[in-house]
Amino acid sequence: VKNLDDMVELFKDMKEICPTDDSGNPTYAMSLWPDWDGNYVMYVKSMATAYYGYDEFGFGHYNPETGEWYYAMDNGSPYLEMLKFFNTLYREGLLDPDSMTQNYDKMMEKVQNGGVFFSIFNYAGSAGFNSPEHIAENKIMRSLVPEEGAPIAYGMSVYGGNRVWSIGAK
C-alpha cells in the first residue's frame, strides 16, 4: 500500500471479503465519533497528523522537519487533503454513516464486533478488536502505514503542546 488511493482500494477489497461483522451488521473501513471534536473533526485532523507527520498547531498543521505551517483551510493543506480522503470513503460506502452522530462507546462496539477495518488509534482499533476470542480465530487487527506515510512521534515539539505528565505528592 503506497498511498491513500491504495488504501481506498484495499478497503474496497476488505469489504468485499467481509461485508458484515460478527453480529451481521455492515462493515466499514473507518468509523468516527464526534465526542472529541474541537477546532477540527478530530479524527480527520489526527489522520493528517498520522499520515503526513505534521502536528496540530493552532488551526493548522506544523511540519517539524521544515518549520512550515499549513493553515487548515488553505487549498492543498493536510487537513483538506484528509477531508477529501474521508469524502472518498463516504462516497464508496466505506465510512460508517453513523460517524457524525455516534459516541465513542458505540464506535468501540463496532470495532469489537469486527465492523471496522482500520483505525489510526491503537485504543480505538487493535486494542479493542484483538480479543482472546478473535486471536484464537486468527482474526487480528494490525498496524498499516502506507509507504508515503510519515507518522509523527509526540513529545518532540520545541513549541510545547497539550501532553502533560504530572504526579501528585499526596
Regions found by a protein language model. Give the residues of each.
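Extracytoplasmic/secretory soluble proteins
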Residues: 1-170
